């Protein structure tokens, strides 16, 4: 192996994609489940340069002949370069987190910062916050140690913090939907930063957005930034414009990996347009209504007849949460998906939402849709749901012309979303 990543578990790593997109060299993922395997690998030194992830960022320091002062102060190395048999250790997580905060206008000067978690990434983010002038940095733990000045999550809510940083795995794929801090009860918050990058928006970030926190950002751009700075060490050269490269690769990753969800009234064209979009973009097509039928074994009219709309909506939420946490899908949603906020969180966590807007007079009546029994029913439904569609959507796609027109409008909207 020349270049690559070592760690105990690497199943969901994006590092290979990022490095090969950035530099074109072959980048291996090398899982080393045990400490013995990690030590044997490091002792052989049969690589040019590697990145190191959990749980070996501290262990690798034992094998380094030189450790960058910043990495030494943090107590963790995530980038190792082999120079004629001598290992040189650096910490580009610091640089990546600093870039993320700078890029999104997070100002630490004079602020109170709470950091969720006590692991290695805590030390990295704490160093950045202190170096950028934070007045106070507080540590939050599920099992706080008063002798270390640690706070509980309940105490963090009343800490007066302006900035929250999450360094725990709470809300990380596949265990999405977890949020241990009530950010809505922290009115002075200016920024919430989560180092978790899968899903794109954790439950913490989604709730911060709902609470109106000015800056709420996940960790994907940090991941890309630390990789770019690691590649500079790998190749012993600076990129001409690293921030531009970071933005380019982050946008490309989101475009490639995020879901696209289509919402709108029954018979507005979500399924037909969705299949075309999925084919054009190379995504897996998912029809949530079809998945409900597959899982339950009954038709939608039969579910409504037996359990009512509430029973159907519960099943709809289950399927939305099942598919919403995955990636690279085109998801066609039922017309009533917007009636439950948890559905929208599930769709937004790892995707963008397009509202397919078709004139109500062009919608179909009946057709096995229990709530579309008449045109009057459709008009009433549209009046109730339209504000919800508009609030949920990242873009509105008119569908009052040809299918090609709608497809073109959707592609243009996606370009604008992913390139912004």
Model-predicted regions and their roles:
Residues 244-255, 260, 276, 280, ...:
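NTP-dependent small-molecule kinase module
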């Amino acid at each position: 192996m020349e270049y690559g990543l070592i760690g105990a578990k690497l199943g969901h790593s994006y590092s290979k994609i990022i490095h090969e997109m950035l530099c074109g060299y072959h980048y291996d993922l090398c899982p080393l489940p045990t400490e013995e395997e990690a030590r044997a690998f490091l002792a052989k030194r049969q690589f040019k340069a590697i990145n190191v992830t959990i749980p070996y960022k501290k262990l690798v320091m034992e094998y380094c002949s030189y450790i960058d002062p910043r990495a030494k102060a943090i107590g963790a190395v995530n980038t190792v370069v082999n120079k004629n048999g001598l290992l040189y250790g650096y910490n580009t997580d610091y640089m990546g987190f600093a870039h993320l905060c700078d890029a999104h206008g997070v100002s630490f000067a004079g602020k109170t910062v709470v950091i969720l978690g006590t692991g290695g990434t805590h030390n990295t983010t704490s160093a950045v916050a202190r170096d950028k002038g934070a007045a106070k940095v507080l540590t939050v733990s599920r099992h706080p140690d008063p002798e270390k000045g640690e706070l509980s999550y309940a105490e963090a809510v009343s800490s007066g913090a302006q900035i929250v940083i999450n360094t725990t795995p709470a809300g990380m794929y596949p265990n999405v939907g977890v949020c241990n801090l009530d950010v809505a009860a922290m009115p002075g918050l200016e920024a919430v930063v989560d180092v978790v990058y899968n899903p794109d928006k954790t439950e913490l970030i989604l709730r911060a957005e709902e609470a109106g926190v000015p800056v709420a950002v996940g960790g994907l751009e940090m991941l890309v930034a630390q990789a770019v700075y690691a590649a500079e060490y790998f190749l012993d050269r600076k990129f001409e414009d690293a921030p531009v490269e970071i933005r380019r690769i982050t946008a490309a990753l989101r475009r490639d990996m995020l879901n696209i969800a289509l919402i709108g009234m029954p018979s507005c064209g979500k399924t037909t347009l969705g299949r075309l979009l999925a084919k054009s973009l190379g995504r897996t097509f998912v029809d949530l209504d079809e998945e409900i039928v597959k899982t339950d074994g009954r038709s939608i009219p039969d579910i409504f007849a037996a359990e009512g709309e509430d029973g159907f909506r519960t099943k709809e939420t289950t399927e939305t949460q099942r598919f919403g946490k995955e990636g690279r899908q085109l998801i066609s949603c039922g017309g009533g998906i917007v009636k439950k906020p948890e559905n929208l969180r599930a769709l937004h966590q790892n995707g963008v939402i397009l509202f397919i807007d078709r004139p109500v007079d062009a919608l179909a009546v009946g057709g096995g849709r229990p709530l579309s029994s008449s045109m009057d029913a459709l008009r009433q439904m549209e009046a109730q749901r339209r504000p919800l569609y508009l609030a949920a959507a990242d873009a509105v796609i008119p569908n009052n012309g040809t299918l090609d027109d709608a497809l073109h409008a959707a592609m243009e909207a996606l370009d604008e979303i992913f390139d912004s």
